[in-house]
Amino acid sequence: VQEFLNWTVDTIREDRLISPWLEEKKYEWVPLVSKSVTNILEKGRSVLVITDSDRDWFLKYVLTHINSQKKNRPFLPFYNFKSFYKDLDEVKTEDEINFIKDMLNISFPNGYCFWYIGRSQDARAILPKFSKNSFLWIFDEEIQDAFNLKNNDEALDMKLLQMFRLYDKTLSASLFAEINVEH
């Protein structure tokens, strides 16, 4: 079983489709991914994926590829949050947030976590930002316990695809006990 930080660096270096920029962010990446993978594989939590509207394409990409039959692994519990609650753009009050959380607690007795990809100030970010165990890829704001990116980065779309590729490889390696993501 390889140590997670070293495995991450080796994977970035060996995969010609992942650029070196991600290696420079390894100390941000590793603890966030470790927490996310542990939530799924160790704690049995489901992942509710949310993006801002500019990243709807990425949401479709993630959900199409995460459980692809080509992966030769068990399907993992990743869901489009909009399939549970369509009016996320309209959530404004604490009561609405609590009603949604109550529904999710009933629906997911083992627990759930959010994976949010998008602008920090977007209405869709409210629920994930204030929920524990969220996996956050946040744009245009430096937030602790989030992977921070810039919305005006010309390479942003490519970076998202590379990050997903590394995350997906991490899920497989963890699932097949090639690495241990826990510290």
Q: Where would I find each of the regions flagged by the language model?
A:
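Conserved N-terminal alpha-helical segment that immediately precedes and caps sugar-phosphate-binding
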Residues: 1-183
